[in-house]
């Protein structure tokens, strides 16, 4: 620590590094915990802040993103913050129009339909320069966190971004995106390469701006079986990690732990554990003991309580957390949900989840 209390990048010195130590595989006094979508609509203060402007205008406001990121930290003793943003800012920066339709979700008025539509996309190298507002939000949030907990940056993985860009929004089948994989494999690889080339400088830029860890969301992994996943998703997941780490080294920046969360990607756990990430996130369909057997001690695991468990009583939440922590064990583990928090969840039950993780994980270490 420097004499003025600032860290090497001029940010306040980190006071709680439990999350980072667990991510790197070091011993911790208790199990760290954070929640995907912890900055979300289940919080009344979030709804109030968001009511002032539309979704992507909020994403482009560093002040609003900072405020939304900090809100859950004021309520709960979480061990990490994750910047408020959206994975679809990357397709926007590539030149695609994206709107957020209330009650429906993201919509692309002009999705990619033909191979020649790829010509509409901007050079991926300009993406980071288009997303300065995300970097500003990260820097502002890092300052205002005042070293309380680490700040996580994130992005969507190439396949998941491709699904939105081709489907034109969400889909229960991803049939249009998968049609590309079968009918236009070369164009699919071209698009996935464009996205990878856009993501690498974007993620590096987040670290330069102050992010202390990075999570890559492969939210639509489950729409691919092992064969398609290994061909169209895994190579790019690997490449993102490899290139981000190389660029950080070249820039003389300290490495940050990287997390891969491939929802419903249980069939690829072993491959994901060897993809160059320090942490593998799990959804609730994976049994913790089986996951640990599969990946061994090579990576930290993160997850994986069913988000709907938070509809249970606070007492039952405590019991479910105890079982989860017993199954994962105290080493190389970060507690989280198996997916994001839902808008109708009770903040009190989120607090019960966080408190139960801290309480039981301390007891585990005493025994």
Curated annotation (Swiss-Prot):
User: Changing residue 193 to P: what effect?
Assistant: In FPCT; insoluble protein
UniProt-reported outcome of changing residue 220 to P: In HEP; mild form
Could you name the domain of life of the organism this protein comes from?
Answer: Eukaryota
- Documented effect of changing residue 167 to K: In HEP and FPCT; nearly normal activity
Q: Which residues, renumbered to this chain, carry the PTM N-acetylmethionine?
A: 1
The UniProt keyword set, sorted, is:
Acetylation, Cytoplasm, Decarboxylase, Disease variant, Heme biosynthesis, Lyase, Porphyrin biosynthesis
GO MF annotation, one: uroporphyrinogen decarboxylase activity
Main localization (coarse): cytoplasm
Q: Per its UniProt record, what SUPFAM superfamilies does this chain match?
A: UROD/MetE-like
List the Pfam families: URO-D (PF01208)
Has UniProt tagged this entry with the keyword Cytoplasm?
Answer: yes
Q: Name the pathway it acts in.
A: Porphyrin-containing compound metabolism; protoporphyrin-IX biosynthesis; coproporphyrinogen-III from 5-aminolevulinate: step 4/4
Residues annotated for coproporphyrinogen III binding in this entry: 37, 39, 41, 86, 164, 219, 339
What does altering residue 168 to R do?
Answer: In HEP; relative activity of 65% of wild-type towards uroporphyrinogen III
Note the effect listed for residue 165 to R.
In FPCT; activity < 2%
Task: Tell me which disease this protein is linked to.
Answer: Familial porphyria cutanea tarda: A form of porphyria. Porphyrias are inherited defects in the biosynthesis of heme, resulting in the accumulation and increased excretion of porphyrins or porphyrin precursors. They are classified as erythropoietic or hepatic, depending on whether the enzyme deficiency occurs in red blood cells or in the liver. Familial porphyria cutanea tarda is an autosomal dominant disorder characterized by light-sensitive dermatitis, with onset in later life. It is associated with the excretion of large amounts of uroporphyrin in the urine. Hepatoerythropoietic porphyria: A form of porphyria. Porphyrias are inherited defects in the biosynthesis of heme, resulting in the accumulation and increased excretion of porphyrins or porphyrin precursors. They are classified as erythropoietic or hepatic, depending on whether the enzyme deficiency occurs in red blood cells or in the liver. HEP is a cutaneous porphyria that presents in infancy. It is characterized biochemically by excessive excretion of acetate-substituted porphyrins and accumulation of protoporphyrin in erythrocytes.
Its biological purpose is as follows:
Catalyzes the sequential decarboxylation of the four acetate side chains of uroporphyrinogen to form coproporphyrinogen and participates in the fifth step in the heme biosynthetic pathway. Isomer I or isomer III of uroporphyrinogen may serve as substrate, but only coproporphyrinogen III can ultimately be converted to heme. In vitro also decarboxylates pentacarboxylate porphyrinogen I.
**Quaternary organization:** Homodimer.
- Give the protein name, as stated in the record: Uroporphyrinogen decarboxylase
Lineage, highest ranks first:
Eukaryota, Metazoa, Chordata, Craniata, Vertebrata
């Amino acid at each position: 620590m420097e004499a003025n209390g600032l860290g090497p990048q001029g940010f306040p010195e980190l006071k709680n590094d439990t999350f980072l130590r667990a991510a790197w595989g070091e011993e911790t006094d208790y199990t760290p915990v954070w929640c995907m979508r912890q900055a979300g609509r289940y919080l009344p203060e979030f709804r109030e802040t968001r009511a002032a402007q539309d979704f992507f205008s909020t994403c482009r406001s560093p002040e609003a993103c900072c405020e939304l990121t900090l809100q859950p930290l004021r309520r709960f003793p979480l061990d990490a913050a994750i910047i408020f943003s959206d994975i679809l800012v990357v397709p926007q920066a590539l030149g695609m129009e994206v709107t957020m339709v209330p009650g429906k979700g993201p919509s692309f008025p002009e999705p990619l339909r033909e191979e020649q539509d790829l010509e509409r996309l901007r050079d991926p190298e300009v993406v980071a320069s288009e997303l300065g507002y995300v970097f500003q939000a990260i820097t502002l949030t890092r300052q205002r966190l005042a070293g309380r907990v680490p700040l996580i940056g994130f992005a969507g993985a190439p396949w998941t971004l491709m699904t939105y860009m081709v489907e034109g929004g969400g889909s229960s089948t991803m049939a249009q995106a998968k049609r590309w994989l079968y009918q236009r494999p070369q164009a699919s690889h071209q698009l996935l390469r464009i996205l990878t080339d856009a993501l690498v400088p974007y993620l590096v830029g987040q670290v330069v701006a102050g992010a202390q860890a990075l999570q890559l969301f492969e939210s639509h992994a489950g729409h691919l079986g092992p064969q398609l996943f290994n061909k169209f998703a895994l190579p790019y997941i690997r490449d993102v990690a490899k290139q981000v780490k190389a660029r950080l080294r070249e820039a003389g920046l300290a490495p940050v732990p990287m997390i891969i969360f491939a929802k419903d990607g249980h069939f690829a756990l072993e491959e994901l554990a060897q993809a160059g990430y320090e942490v593998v996130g799990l959804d609730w369909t994976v049994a913790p003991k089986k996951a640990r057997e599969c990946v061994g001690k090579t990576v930290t695991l993160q997850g994986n309580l069913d988000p709907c468990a938070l509809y249970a009583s606070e007492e039952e939440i405590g019991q479910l957390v105890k079982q989860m922590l017993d199954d994962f064990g105290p080493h190389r583990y970060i507690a989280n949900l198996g997916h994001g928090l839902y808008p109708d969840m009770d903040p009190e039950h989120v607090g019960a989840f966080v408190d139960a993780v801290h309480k039981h994980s301390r007891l585990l270490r005493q025994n």
